[in-house]
From Swiss-Prot:
GO molecular function: ABC-type D-methionine transporter activity; ATP binding; ATP hydrolysis activity
UniProt-listed Enzyme Commission number(s): 7.4.2.11
PROSITE patterns named in the record: ABC_TRANSPORTER_1, ABC_TRANSPORTER_2, METN
Entries under InterPro entries matching the protein: AAA+_ATPase (IPR003593), ABC_transporter-like_ATP-bd (IPR003439), ABC_transporter-like_CS (IPR017871), ACT-like_dom_sf (IPR045865), MetN_ABC (IPR041701), MetN_ABC_transporter-like (IPR050086), NIL_domain (IPR018449), P-loop_NTPase (IPR027417)
Listed SMART domains: AAA, NIL
Name of the protein described by the UniProt record: Methionine import ATP-binding protein MetN
GO cellular component, one term: plasma membrane
Segments crossing the lipid bilayer: none
Species this chain originates from: Rhizobium johnstonii (strain DSM 114642 / LMG 32736 / 3841)
Domain ABC transporter: 23-258
Subunit structure and binding partners: The complex is composed of two ATP-binding proteins (MetN), two transmembrane proteins (MetI) and a solute-binding protein (MetQ).
Localization per Swiss-Prot or TrEMBL: Cell inner membrane
Catalyzed chemical reaction(s): L-methionine(out) + ATP + H2O = L-methionine(in) + ADP + phosphate + H(+); D-methionine(out) + ATP + H2O = D-methionine(in) + ADP + phosphate + H(+)
Chief place of localization: membrane
C-alpha cells in the first residue's frame, strides 16, 4: 500500500512538473549535409518564463526556432510543446499546435495594403472568426501594445518600433501559450529596442506569457530574460540564471559575447602584458551577490596590507543581483603575494584569473 501511494505521489509530482513546462527539448539533432546545425540540444522553458538563447551567426539559433514551430523537422530527439511531441506530427496535425505559438521576426512582415487593425486581426480571419470578434480582439491588443490610436493607419506611416508593436499584437491574436522572438530587435535603434523589450516584459507580467528569445545581443538578454542558454556549433554550452552567467561565464564563447557589456582591462595595459614576471601581476576578479558591493577589497587590504591596487572595474545590477568585475595589480616584489591574494579572494567566492604581468609599470 505504501509503495502504491509512493508511486502515485511520484507520478503526480512528475505530471505537475511537466504541466509547468511549455517547452522541453531532449537531444534534438538536425543536420544539413555534413553540417550539424543542432547537435544534441536539450533544454526546458517553464510556463511564464523568459528564456534567452544567444549565440553567434551560424551557431544554430535559427534552425532551433524553426524546429520549435515545426517549419524544420528534427532528425532525431524529442520536441515537446505543452507536453506533446511535435516531431512525428503531420502538417495537418501541426496546424492547431502552431496556433499555440506566436512569433515575431526581425522584419515585420506586415501587409502594406491592410490597416494596422486588419494586420493584427489576420490570424483570426484565417481561423474563421467573425469580423466583429476579430476587430474586438485587435483593439484589445492594440491597447496592450500602446497603438490604440493607430488602428486605421497603414504600415507605411509607422516607425520601425511601431511596426514591431503591430507584429507583437498580431502574434498574440490567437492567445498563444508561447511567443518566439527571432532577432526581433536587431533592426531597431537602441532606444526603440529598450521600449520593445519593456513591452515584452510587461506582456509577460500581465499575461503570464512564456517567451523564448533568439538573439546575438547580450544586452537584450540582460534587459529581459530570466535565464539564458548559450548555443555554439549546435550545442548548448552554458545555461543558467542571467545574473549568474554574467557574473561567472564558464564557456569561452560566453565570455566573448559578454565583452561589450562587462568591464574590460584598459587597452594600454592589456597591450603590454607579458607571461614573464614583471613589476606587477594583473588579476581579474569577478564577484556576485553581497561580495560584489566592494567590502571584499577592504577586507583584503586589512588582511594583506599594500598587497594590491585597483586598476579598473565596476558594479552592475542584473535581476536585482549585484554583479561586479574588477582588475587589480599585485606587486611582484614577493613572488608568493599574487598567490596569497588569489587564495584570499577565491575563498570568498570570487572568480580570479591572473592575466599576466605589467612589465612597464614603475
Amino acid at each position: 500500500m505504501n509503495s502504491l501511494v509512493s508511486t502515485t505521489a511520484i507520478e503526480a509530482q512528475s505530471q505537475a512538473a511537466a504541466s509547468e513546462e511549455v517547452v522541453r527539448l531532449t537531444d534534438v539533432k538536425r543536420r544539413f549535409g555534413t553540417t550539424a546545425a543542432l547537435d544534441g540540444i536539450s533544454l526546458t522553458v517553464k510556463r511564464g518564463e523568459i528564456l534567452g538563447i544567444i549565440g553567434r551567426s551560424g551557431a544554430g539559433k535559427s534552425t532551433l526556432i524553426r524546429c520549435l514551430n515545426g517549419l524544420e523537422r528534427a532528425d532525431s530527439g524529442e520536441i515537446l510543446i505543452e507536453g506533446r511531441d511535435i516531431t512525428g506530427l503531420s502538417e495537418q496535425e501541426l496546424q492547431p499546435l502552431r496556433r499555440r505559438i506566436g512569433m515575431i521576426f526581425q522584419h515585420f512582415n506586415l501587409l502594406s495594403a491592410k490597416t494596422v487593425e486588419e494586420n493584427v486581426a489576420l490570424p483570426l480571419k484565417i481561423e474563421g472568426l467573425a469580423k466583429s470578434e476579430r476587430l474586438k480582439r485587435a483593439h484589445e491588443l492594440l491597447e496592450l501594445v500602446g497603438l490604440a490610436d493607430k488602428a486605421k493607419a497603414y504600415p507605411a506611416s509607422l516607425s520601425g518600433g511601431q511596426k514591431q508593436r503591430v507584429g507583437i499584437a498580431r502574434a498574440l491574436a490567437a492567445r498563444p501559450a508561447l511567443l518566439l522572438s527571432d532577432e526581433a530587435t536587431s533592426a531597431l535603434d537602441p532606444e526603440t529596442t529598450r521600449s520593445i523589450l519593456a513591452l515584452l516584459k510587461d506582456i509577460n507580467r500581465k499575461l503570464g506569457l512564456t517567451i523564448l528569445l533568439i538573439t546575438h545581443e547580450m544586452e537584450v538578454v540582460r534587459g529581459i530574460a530570466d535565464r539564458v542558454a548559450v548555443i555554439d556549433a549546435g550545442r548548448i554550452v552554458e545555461e543558467g540564471q542571467v545574473w549568474s552567467v554574467f557574473a561567472n561565464p564558464q564557456a569561452e564563447i560566453t565570455g566573448s559575447l559578454l565583452c561589450g557589456i562587462r568591464p574590460q582591462l584598459p587597452e594600454h595595459i592589456a597591450g603590454r602584458l607579458s607571461a614573464a614576471a614583471g613589476s606587477e601581476a594583473i588579476l581579474s576578479v569577478d564577484l556576485a551577490g553581497p561580495q560584489a558591493q566592494g567590502a571584499l577589497f577592504a577586507e583584503l587590504s586589512a588582511a594583506l596590507p599594500h598587497s594590491f591596487r585597483l586598476v579598473h572595474g565596476g558594479i552592475d545590477h542584473i535581476q536585482n543581483q549585484p554583479v561586479a568585475r574588477f582588475f587589480i595589480a599585485v606587486p611582484a616584489r614577493d613572488p608568493a603575494l599574487a598567490g596569497k591574494v588569489e587564495q584570499f579572494l577565491t575563498a570568498r567566492s570570487a572568480r580570479v584569473e591572473v592575466l599576466g604581468y605589467d612589465t612597464d609599470h614603475a
